[in-house]
Amino acid sequence: MRILIANDDGVTAPGIAALYDALADHADCVVIAPDQDKSGASSSLTLDRPLHPQRLDNGFISLNGTPTDCVHLGLNGLLEELPDMVVSGINLGANLGDDVLYSGTVAAAIEGRFLKGPAFAFSLVSRLTDNLPTAMHFARLLVSAHERLAVPPRTVLNVNIPNLPLDRVRGIQLTRLGHRARAAAPVKVVNPRGKEGYWIAAAGDAEDGGPGTDFHAVMQGYVSITPLQLDRTFHEAFGGLDEWLGGLT
């Protein structure tokens, strides 16, 4: 099995090295990742300049682009052999609920949706590395068992691991995405020369975080696994829209 590994924290981030170490004994792994932190890049592609891959001393490939660029190039000519699946992470920080709309970690996995194996996005619910071994364990466990998994084509599995030692993790729960409240207002700053700027503030707290959600699972000490799809059509709105459009003609 051949796996393409990517992330959004950057090619030198500890999480991607940990993911490689977790999977390298079970598969032929190749790493293509951004040359700098691209958190929040979502599924953006770089269209205003050429992309220049550079192989590092450890064999990883660094790219001056986004997480999606990395996977896109990896699946479309940069690699001699097409991977069987894409695995993204390990992100240092949660990708829960609405986070998946902005996450470069999730976006990298989404770009791998056309392959025969399901794509995985792994995130540790912490900015610290203390419990990376826990995330490594579950990444290895889930990816190595993927051949027994029967899911529709183009399924992306978003996995969040609680910030706990392995012996304190209570298990794995299948979850749906929760929802966050509106984010805090951007923080205004003024530099010494009087020029104004803004920092994007923290994401909102869980507004829909009850039982069954990814938020609830990790708070209770479980690994959360949420299947994602690309169809973002809001089917429940069809009735009202159909009636509204009928009244316009």
UniProtKB/Swiss-Prot annotation:
The answer on whether this UniProt entry bears the keyword Cytoplasm reads yes
> Keywords assigned by UniProt?
Cytoplasm, Hydrolase, Metal-binding, Nucleotide-binding
The reply on keyword Hydrolase is yes
The reaction(s) catalysed by this protein are:
a ribonucleoside 5'-phosphate + H2O = a ribonucleoside + phosphate
List of residues binding a divalent metal cation: 8-9, 39, 91
Q: GO molecular-function annotation terms?
A: 3'-nucleotidase activity; 5'-nucleotidase activity; exopolyphosphatase activity; metal ion binding; nucleotide binding
Check the record and name the Gene3D superfamilies matching this protein: Survival protein SurE-like phosphatase/nucleotidase
Primary localization = cytoplasm
Q: Which GO terms describe its cellular component?
A: cytoplasm
* Cofactor annotation: a divalent metal cation
Subcellular location as annotated: Cytoplasm
Membrane-spanning intervals of the chain: none
Note the HAMAP family from the entry. Answer: SurE
Instruction: Provide the function of this protein.
Output: Nucleotidase that shows phosphatase activity on nucleoside 5'-monophosphates.
Protein name, please? Answer: 5'-nucleotidase SurE
Q: Which organism is it from?
A: Pseudomonas aeruginosa (strain ATCC 15692 / DSM 22644 / CIP 104116 / JCM 14847 / LMG 12228 / 1C / PRS 101 / PAO1)
